């Protein structure tokens, strides 16, 4: 994946459309296509990758944060439908914070929080999946950030995210 950094009014629309195609359209289509077969067999687990960003407002990265929120809400919604139909199929969401990947270079951002290794995130995620968890957030600091975001007013979270992102300009 990749992000588009900058004021929404100034960011490149073509890059944002590619971001939406990657983070929203592809996830939606692939989930729908794979889910049908899994439901027929009553077996399977789809893991969609969201982000801690999907739980926060995202000034200066509006398209990215919004796309990750879509992934989280889509997955949660489908999973609830599956549970209500007594299906054994699950749709999970991985909600990581910074992970050491090429994303930072492509998005041209630096993270204030310590990045987790991709190996740690993968092992943690598989462990939680095998235990039937569907809302997976690796890292204590990211879990804490997610909790604070949940109990904070949106306008306060927006201001904090803006100040944090602004330092990257």
Segments and roles (model prediction):
Residues 58-62:
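Active-site loop immediately N-terminal to the catalytic Tyr-X3-Lys motif
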Residues 56, 77-89:
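Active-site-adjacent segment of SDR/Rossmann-fold oxidoreductases
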Residues 93, 110-146:
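C-terminal helical subdomain
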Residues 31, 67:
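Active-site helix of classical SDR
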Residues 33-42:
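A short helix-coil junction within the Rossmann-fold of NAD(P)-dependent oxidoreductases
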Residues 5-8, 15-18:
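Substrate-binding pocket helix/loop in short-chain dehydrogenase/reductase
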Residues 51:
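Residue(s) in the substrate-gating loop at a strand-loop-helix junction
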């Amino acid at each position: 994946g990749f992000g588009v950094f900058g004021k929404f009014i100034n960011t490149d629309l073509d890059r944002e459309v590619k971001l939406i195609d990657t983070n929203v359209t592809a996830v939606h289509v692939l989930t729908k296509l794979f889910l049908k077969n899994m439901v027929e067999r009553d077996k399977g687990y789809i893991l969609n990758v969201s982000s801690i960003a999907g739980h926060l407002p995202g000034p200066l990265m509006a398209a990215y944060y919004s796309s990750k929120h879509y992934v989280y809400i889509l997955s949660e919604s489908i999973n609830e439908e599956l549970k209500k139909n007594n299906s054994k199929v699950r749709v999970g969401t991985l909600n990581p914070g910074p992970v050491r990947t090429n994303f930072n270079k492509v998005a041209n951002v630096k993270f204030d929080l310590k990045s987790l290794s991709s190996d740690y995130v993968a092992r943690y995620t598989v462990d939680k999946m095998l235990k039937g968890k569907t809302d997976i957030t690796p890292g204590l600091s990211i879990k804490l950030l997610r909790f604070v975001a949940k109990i904070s007013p949106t306008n306060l979270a927006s201001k904090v995210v803006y100040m944090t992102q602004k330092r990257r300009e």
